Amino acid sequence: MDPKTQQLRDRVKRFAIRVVRFVRTLPQTVDGQEIGRQLLRAGTGVSANYHATGRSRSRAEFVAKLGVVLEEADEAEHWVDVLHQANIGRGDDLQWLRDEAAQLRAIFRQSVKTARANHARTSARR
């Protein structure tokens, strides 16, 4: 595995772990717990689905799986923003999650764009 891929894999795993720890700190209210569950699913989904891209059997499958990672990153960012706007959760941890979710979404948006272009170029050569 190339070093950049491993670095990103480690980064998304760190994000998932921070999400898990953050969700544990949310208030035991209906809104805190429900939004926390949504964030937990999306935040850990970024890591799990990125890990799954390494098992892609084709370029098309890789592009599709990377698209799922982007969707999960986008959703995680959404739920973090909801928590922020609803004033639920601790400041520093929440701010780190907001920043990291936005950065991961941007990384995966560009990755999907690049992977699609590479796939189209490869498909056109055949």
Predicted regions and their residues:
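Amphipathic alpha-helical assembly/interaction segments
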Residues: M1-R126
